[in-house]
């Protein structure tokens, strides 16, 4: 089973091996009282540092849940495992089930009411907003994402990863609702920040670029210029995604689909002008 997005034959692993590795690393971090609890091992490839997706993400969601389900309901590891199960189900398109699980996580976290719980609540709230978007409930997703970003800015600096992540999600919601006059300046403001802080190959950077390309190709008084700019951005994005994720990764294929669509629109526009 292909366990990550690594190139060539690298990354092929059994889910049972990935599960055992995650268990060991999380247990070691807990024993050593490490600030990094290694929880990301359940959803992030240790080699290429990209998120698992599809069948693998779903299988690991069930694996992490089975690992920690016996802990008390308010135990942090159990709460995180429940959220990972929801994300895994979402990876297979089971978004109604995912939403129910995330809402249960939200209720548990609120009841815990411990120090620092705000960050965990925002993380779950973000997953709920993502699920709203996947279910086509874009106004609900936008409302929640505005709330999240407002709270996050009170906790983090503008260039911190959580803020950049929330900005990306907000921009996606604005694009879905065709609110390009708001999303376009947001993308243009934060893409240089993401490039400087995260690098050009980071998934948030490439997602922001796709978001800006969508916004400028759909909005503006100069459709041809907008299409040319968007095509240039997606072409550069395509090269990076192929190098980092490979040709068959969903993100690469989605970028290619958008690029093909915009090239088709440009060809139609130029045909009309001749």
List the predicted regions and their residue ranges.
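N-terminal C2H2 zinc-finger "knuckle"
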Residues: 5
């Amino acid at each position: 089973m292909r366990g990550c997005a690594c190139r060539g034959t690298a990354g092929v692993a059994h889910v049972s091996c990935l599960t055992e590795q995650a268990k060991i690393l999380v247990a070691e971090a807990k024993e050593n009282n490490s600030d990094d609890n290694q929880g990301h091992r359940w959803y992030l490839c240790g080699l290429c540092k990209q998120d698992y997706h599809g069948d693998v993400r779903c299988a690991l969601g069930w694996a992490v849940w089975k690992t920690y389900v016996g802990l008390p309901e308010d135990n942090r590891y159990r709460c995180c495992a429940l959220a990972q199960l929801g994300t895994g189900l979402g990876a297979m398109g089971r978004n109604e089930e995912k939403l129910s699980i995330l809402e249960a996580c939200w209720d548990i976290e609120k009841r815990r009411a411990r120090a620092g719980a705000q960050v965990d609540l925002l993380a779950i709230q973000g997953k709920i907003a993502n699920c709203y978007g996947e279910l086509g409930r874009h106004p609900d997703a936008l409302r929640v994402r505005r709330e999240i970003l407002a709270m996050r800015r009170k906790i983090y600096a503008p260039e911190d990863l959580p803020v950049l992540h929330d900005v990306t999600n907000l921009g996606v919601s604005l694009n879905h609702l065709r609110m390009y006059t708001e999303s376009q300046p947001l993308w243009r403001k934060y893409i240089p920040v993401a490039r400087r802080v995260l690098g050009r190959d980071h998934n948030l950077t490439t997602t922001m670029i796709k978001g800006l390309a969508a916004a400028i190709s759909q909005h503006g008084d100069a459709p041809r210029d907008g299409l040319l700019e968007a095509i240039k951005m997606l072409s550069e994005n395509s090269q990076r995604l192929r190098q980092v994720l490979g040709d068959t990764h969903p993100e690469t294929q989605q970028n290619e689909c958008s690029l093909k669509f915009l090239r088709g629109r440009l060809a139609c526009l130029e045909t009309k002008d001749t």
